[in-house]
Design a protein with these regions (language model features):
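Short N-terminal edge-element motif at the start of the domain
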Residues: 2-46, 51-52
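Calycin-type beta-barrel ligand-binding domains and close structural analogs
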Residues: 5, 15, 19-25, 51-146
């Protein structure tokens, strides 16, 4: 059965935040907002910290739909994630391909899970010497609908 881009977008396009996680572990997780929406032919996202209200990342994306996966392309960086259905068939798992590097030569590792109520994201950036530049947190950010 082909993967459903309509269901993927239905699950993804919401206003999300990690308020509960930030309240439970304030020394580990900042309170972050992460919004996704479709405008015209493009998928957009923006992120900001609750304390400042200033957007620190805004991106435009496009999807390439295949029979068994969705390729989420990040237009600004040229990087992408491959989403497949999870084992339950009621959600999605997205990962950067192995050996993904950004324009600065930093190895990027991202794992995202998505279902009708939860979006989790774990990102790690590693330099050529194996030093972790980001992603030292104890687990993924866990976002819920706002």
């Amino acid at each position: 059965m082909a993967i459903s881009s309509a269901l993927f977008l239905e699950y993804l396009c919401h206003n999300w935040d990690n308020l509960k996680q930030a309240q439970q572990w304030p020394n580990e997780f900042a309170h972050v907002h992460y919004d996704w929406w479709v405008e015209g032919a493009h998928l957009h996202s923006k992120q900001w910290y609750d304390w400042s209200g200033e957007v620190y990342r805004e991106r435009t994306h496009h999807l390439d739909i295949q029979d068994n996966h969705i390729k989420l392309n990040i237009n600004e960086s040229g990087l992408h994630l491959i989403f497949t259905e999870d084992e339950t068939g009621h959600g999605f798992i997205g990962k950067t391909p192995p050996d993904t590097y950004n324009e600065k030569g930093i190895k990027i590792e991202t794992v995202i899970t998505l279902d009708c109520a939860t979006y989790t994201s774990f990102d790690k950036g590693t330099d050529k010497d194996g030093n972790i530049l980001w992603g030292k947190i104890p687990g993924p950010f866990i976002f819920k609908h706002t």
